[in-house]
Each structure stands twice: as C-alpha cells, then as structure tokens.
Amino acid sequence: MSWCSSPDAVFHLAATGLLLQIAVPCLCSAAMNTHTRQPISHPTAEHLLAWYDRHHRELPWRTSPAMAAQGKRADPYHVWLSEVMLQQTTVQAVKPYFLKFLAAWPDVNDLAAAPVEDVMAAWAGLGYYARARNLKKCAEAVAREHGGVFPDTEEGLKELPGIGDYTAAAVAAIAFNRQAAVMDGNVERVISRLFVIDAPLPGSKPAMKAKVAALTPADRPGDFAQAMMDLGATICTPKRPACALCPFNGACLALARDEPERFPVKAAKKAKPVRLGAAFVAVNTSGEILLRRRIDSGLLGGMTEVPTTAWTARMDGGTDASHAPFVAGWQAAGVIVHVFTHFELRLTVYRAQVPDGLQTGPDDGWWEPVTNLDAQALPTVMKKVITQAIPSACRPENRN
C-alpha cells in the first residue's frame, strides 16, 4: 500500500489541545506503485463489467445488474429521455427534471400529446432548449409513425427527430442490448488515457470510437456502455483520478507514464465573441410582469422572455432605453452576463413601473404575476434579467 503525505491526505483532530495527524492511503495517480496495479496487460470488457456489478451508480432511469438478473428490462422511453437530458448536463442537474417529466408524462405517447408550451415550461432551467423542442418532435414521431414503440436499431433511431449518433448508440445499447459503440465525454477521457491518444479533440473522436467499438462486447453491451460512463464519472475523473481503484489501471498507458491528467488532449479554445443587447422589465401596479414568447426557431426558440432588443456583436447597438418596447419611465438596473455555447451575452437591464391596463400592442405578450413565474418557460438568462430588476422575484418565498 502506498501512503501519502500530501496535505489533502492528512487529517487533523483537535481535542483538548491535542493535535493528531493520521496518514491515509493515497488513491491518486501520483502515488501508484506497480504492486497496487491490476495484473492485466490490456483492458477487457470482462474486467470492467466485474467492477460495474459491484460499483455501478444507482440512477432513476437505470436498470441495475441485480434488476436485470431478475428479468427486468430497461425502458426505452426512460433511456431516451435521460440521454437527451444528460447531453452537456450533469447527472445531479438531470435527476429532478427526469422525475418531473415522468410524473407529468409517464410514457412517450403522453409526451407526444402534451402541449409544447407545457414541455418547454417543464424544461426551463435545464438549458440547451433545442433539446426540448426536438424531444417533443421525437415523441410525436414515435407515437405517430411507430405506434409508441421506439425503433430498436441505431439506424432506425437516427431517423427520428433530434437523435444523432451518440443518442442512437446509447439507446440501442442500453435499451435494446445492441452492440453499439457509445462514447460521451466520460468515455473519451477513459479511452484517451488507456491508449494515450495524443491527437487533440475533436479530431481524435473517430480513433477513440474505433477503440470503444473494439472493446464493446456482444454480451451486455448496455451495461458496458454504462460502466464506461460510470468509470469516467467516478474514478477516471478530469482531476486527481483515483487510479488505484480503477479496474483498468494495470493496462493504462497514461498511468504507466504517470500523466493521466494530460489526457484527453484538447485543441486550444478560441475566445467567445460578445453580443450586446437590452432587456426591459415592466411591472404594473398589480405586481405583474410583461412577458412574451420567443419565435419557435433559433436560440431559445419557444421559450418565454421579457421584451429585449436584438442581440448584436456591434458595440454601438441596442443597449439604451431608447430601444424600449414602449414609452415609460425606464430606469437602468444593471447588466447581466450569460454565457452560451458559442458566445457571451451582456444585457443591460431596465425596469419601469407602469399602470394596470397599459396597452402594449396585440403581439406584445401578456402580464404575468410575479408569484407565477415558476410556471413559465423562462430560460436561465431571463431569470437573471428579472432578478436583476426585481431581486426578490425568483426567490422561493415568492413562489406559489
């Protein structure tokens, strides 16, 4: 056993003025010695599945090995819903949304029949809202064209709206036990370290996927896919991987070089462009906020917002009160910053107190009580805007 003297691995116990230092075994890669590594020369599905059977994560959408042994099969609807939600989103963030969706729409036919406004409102806060629109379209296609039954092959799944290579492979493997190569960010990290793939992402993805395909077994391919994800999420983490606990540590080339954290290699990120705009929070005497619905296409399509200007890269464009949707006593309330995938948005926020019954035009939205904001499909950026203008608006005490 290797013992670590780093500050992170020393516990200090203070009792009646006595200070104790207790050394603990170190699980990080820097302390790995040859006698702590697994005696395997190359990674195999067998080693990983043995680890997974003991250490898998319990997740609400997952069929565990014990459940599978009792004859329970994965629900394709649950697998598909969770995989769409998990794209670029953490497990902890997804759990409550997954359970909320299941409570509202227990199967794909229920989701297909749901009003799109309800789906968007339920998705609000999870981000990447095109996923929600495609989720609804996909559910409708499954209900309409497949009788509520998901196709059971990668090719068939990819014909559905919003399902690409990754989601098709994940659903095919996990729900239908197809021998599909499933590769998310966690799997990329594991594979790049196992085989010391020096080419930077995203260009190295095809080489990585070929490695995954070669490792994926014909038996239990779904469990293998989930095991790879769990390994990356819990052991082969981006920082301070717990290499001593890894079932592949004896075959890991990055560990043999003592540099697992160098992988995966990523291309240098370009600075995100900045877009500017203004947002206008109008509050009437009854404590209602003027809201409107964005057009269905494009960024945040179909979501709810307060009136805003266009978001522009021009440094002289659309950030003052002269661009307000109507004349009122607009007062500057500050600036919020929100980072999207491809750009950074800076919105100057204005607030105005207006009388009840103000006519804003037939296409300018509706007045919503502050206490009912949780029921609206407000994306995170709009919650930031409203909170900037009305600090208490999105606090729990103001919710019904």
Task: Say what each PLM segment does.
Residues 13, 18-67, 230-400:
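Intrinsically disordered, low-complexity, charged terminal extensions of DNA damage-control enzymes
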Residues 42, 46-47, 51-244, 248-261, ...:
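Catalytic cores of DNA base-excision repair glycosylases
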